[in-house]
Structure formats: C-alpha cells, structure tokens
Amino acid sequence: MSALIETRALARRDERRQAVLLQPTDFALHRADRVSITGASGSGKSVFLRALALLDAPTSGQVLWNHRPIANADIPEYRSRICYLSQRPALIDGTVLDNLRFPFSLKSLRKRHFELATVTALLQHAGKSPDFLAKNASDLSGGESQVVALIRTLQLNPEVLLLDEPTAALDPASSRDVEALIDAWFADDPTRAYVWVSHDLEQAQRMSDIHLHMSAGVLSGATQA
C-alpha cells in the first residue's frame, strides 16, 4: 500500500544548544493507519510531529506527500489536508460559532464553505447541543476548548490528523469526548489516518493499531495491536 506521508532521514538539531532533537527518521503513514507514539517528556515526540506537520523546518531529510517532496507553494494545501492539533490550541475572541467559521476566512480555504449541518453532527458526537455554538470562547473549560479546536479541524475533512497529546490537560470526561470525535471521524472514511502522540500508554493502546516509541530522538517500534 502506498504511503500518504513518508519521511526520509528526517532530523532536527538545535544549533544554539548543539543538541540533537530528532535522529534521522524514516517513517511511513498509510491509509487506515492508527499510529500512536509514546515516550518520556523531552524524548522528541512533539519535535517529530511538528516536523511532520511542516511547522518546524527539519535540519535535514525530507517529508513526502503522496510520494513527492512538498514545494513551498504546496504547504497551505498540505496543512489543510494534514492537520495538526496541539495540546493547548488557540481560539479567537468571540463565540464557538465564530471560531468554527474562522478557517474559511483564510486565503487557502476561501473557496470552501462553512456547513452548519456538519458542525452540528460533530457536536453530537462530543455530546454537545447546538446551543453550545453560542457560548463565548473565553467561558469555555480546557476540555470544551479542545473539543472546539478539534471540530474546527474535522469540519475541513482532513486526510490525516497529527495529534500532539490532545487530551493531556483534560479531565476523563473531556478526554472521552475527544476520543469519541476522533473515532467517529476515522470510522466515517477508511482512507483516513492519524498519528497520536500520548504520554498515556493505555490510551495509546486503545486508540491505535500501530504502537511506536520515542527515546532520545530515536523512533522505534512498529508493533501491531
């Protein structure tokens, strides 16, 4: 099966500190893959995921998308298809609805349109009623903010999710809401895939079929559930 995303000797180094953050890494993500990466804090999990998302430039190596290197002109399209979600996503001032509409004001997405029906269905998966759309973002709990950020991403119909400890700061109920949203998104289309970075081994095993481990910038594992 061909890879959606592939890395070839992808590496990152902090030149100021003369520290290796990510050893040269070969990795392939295929359609229908559910991959988890666990490891200690500072082991390089987030460094790898951010490089995969093209948020931080690698020191060396390549990220391939559909077998091809990614040109600068293709990065906005890549980021709309390969979506990164951080542990503490930023929301804009205004209501939940304002936040969900916001991506469609961006130049790269202006040809696409906000769909209330899609958002309402996603809210239901997270146990939220349509009234939730009127809440002010400043009044949301950490769990509610993460749900909004995830729905904001899922409505774009991404091919791949890159999830950087999305439930690390959440209570168990909010974590279940996030997991339910991702389960529903994945089940809706068998060609989708995700990489989930987690400090929680039980969650990693529950939410993935392929388990990888990061230690001192070295990615290893590839065990099937």
Predicted regions and their residues:
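The feature captures the beta-strand-to-loop junction immediately N-terminal to the Walker
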Residues: 38-40
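Helix-to-loop junction immediately C-terminal to a conserved catalytic motif
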Residues: 53
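ABC ATPase NBD coupling module
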Residues: 69-83
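Conserved catalytic motifs of ABC-family nucleotide-binding domains
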Residues: 89-98, 109-110
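Conserved ABC ATPase "signature" region
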Residues: 113-132
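Conserved ABC ATPase signature
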Residues: 136-140, 144
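Catalytic Walker B motif of ABC-type/P-loop ATPase nucleotide-binding domains
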Residues: 161-165
